A protein has these predicted regions:
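Polyanionic/metal-chelating signatures
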Residues: 96-118, 129-130, 149-161, 242, ...
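N-terminal metal-binding scaffold of metallo-dependent hydrolase/deaminase domains
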Residues: 1-40, 48
Length: 379
């Protein structure tokens, strides 16, 4: 007798073959039979014509910060996702350094509340972090990347400079340890400090470490808009020089004037593969993106630290300088015209509202509103 029998399902087996109708038997957590009239089971599920297929792989996720908050991953499982690749965009939950803990938490705050992360207990060693995850009853499978921003902060904090030879060696050694522990590779978030401060050469050195383990590099490239082609070319050069597989994360062309550039970037990928590289990309099928509001602050200012940034935005004499710096880094044709508040701990009433609409209701300049929210939320 089987443990589970799923009957009358439209089966897609994942091989590329046409779908077919049948039953699936499960024993000890494994599929042991596919066909018709398979026999009895302790539990029978009548699919009644629904589709039964292998679980989907979410190739770009930030759920590694949420294991202890909601290990069921119900939202993912409900959509058929059974495996998640975590630690993307240069952000991972390990390794953390006691010396630069504030920097690591600042990076992690892009995707999770830092108060929660601290209360959960930061795991400083990558192997310790993986061992800890083994004891959490997660609702699906997961594969972990090492975030370059987290790795860089582990060694040198949020400094806007090139690493010394000693610091670069420390990053390489730490990445070796992470790969030995079971990491899939290294991810880059080149629009977010401190990853944004890395040179192409630094990435080649670190990617070469991942390549020794047949790993992969995933990159949120430096620019997804006006300089998209140059940004993709940089990462292809990193892949070529390091002999490492590359995935360009959420491949897209931001802002309507840049629509159509994806044809050129896809051509770059095809040409790279014809020359012997292994370059891939993932994407999502809608014209939107999601990131922290803090990303509106120019990269070169992030090295000042959160407290200094809040001080600058709160000081009437410095506020106009900050406003000009923020606006200078945005597309003049759009700026905050397409920006929506996804969440704000200090202002939950803004959730789901457009920045321009809230600014109009409050009779505030949109950029002034954004700076107020950043200060109130402590970035």
């Amino acid at each position: 007798m089987y443990d589970i029998l799923i009957k009358r399902a439209r089966i897609i087996d994942g091989t590329g073959s046409p779908s077919f109708w049948g039953d699936v038997a499960v024993q000890d957590g494994k599929i042991v039979g596919i066909g018709n009239d398979l026999g009895l089971a302790r539990e029978t599920c009548d699919a009644d014509g629904l589709t039964l297929c292998p679980g989907f792989i979410d190739s770009h996720s930030h759920g590694d910060m949420m294991f202890e908050l909601d290990p069921s991953f119900f939202q993912e499982v409900e959509q058929g996702v059974t495996t998640q690749i975590e630690g993307m965009c240069g952000i991972s939950a390990a390794p953390f350094s006691e010396t630069h803990l504030d920097s690591a938490l600042e990076i992690a705050a892009t995707v999770v509340d830092c108060d929660f992360l601290q209360s959960a207990g930061c795991r400083f060693d990558y192997q310790q972090y993986l061992d800890h995850l083994e004891h959490i009853p997660a609702g699906n499978n997961y594969v972990l990347m090492v975030g370059h921003g987290t790795l860089r902060a582990f060694v040198m904090g949020m400094d806007d400079r090139e690493p010394t030879s000693v610091e670069l060696q420390k990053m390489e050694e730490t990445l070796h340890q992470c790969m030995e522990a079971g990491a899939l590779g290294i991810s880059y978030g080149l629009q977010y400090p401190p990853g944004a401060y890395a040179s192409t050469e630094e990435m080649v050195h670190l990617s070469s470490v991942a390549a020794k383990y047949d790993g992969v590099i995933a990159a949120h490239v430096r620019d997804e808009g006006n300089h998209l082609l140059e940004a993709d070319q940089e990462m292809i050069q990193v892949a070529r020089s390091s002999h490492c597989k590359l995935v360009i994360s959420h491949h897209k062309a931001i802002n309507q004037p840049n629509w159509g550039k994806s044809q050129k970037t896809l051509s770059l990928i095809e040409q790279a593969n014809q020359r012997g590289c292994n370059v891939y990309c993932d994407q999502y099928p809608y014209t939107a993106s999601s990131t922290g509001l803090k990303s509106r602050i120019p990269q070169h200012l992030h090295s000042l630290g959160e407290n200094q940034l809040i001080s600058l935005m709160s000081d009437p004499e410095q506020r106009s300088m900050m406003q000009n710096a923020i606006l200078a880094g945005m597309n003049p044709e759009q700026r905050f015209g397409t920006t929506m508040f996804g969440a704000s701990p200090a202002h939950p009433e803004y959730t789901g509202k457009m920045v321009l609409d809230v600014a109009r209701d409050l009779q505030k300049d949109p950029c002034e509103l954004v700076m107020d929210v950043l200060c109130d939320d402590h970035l």
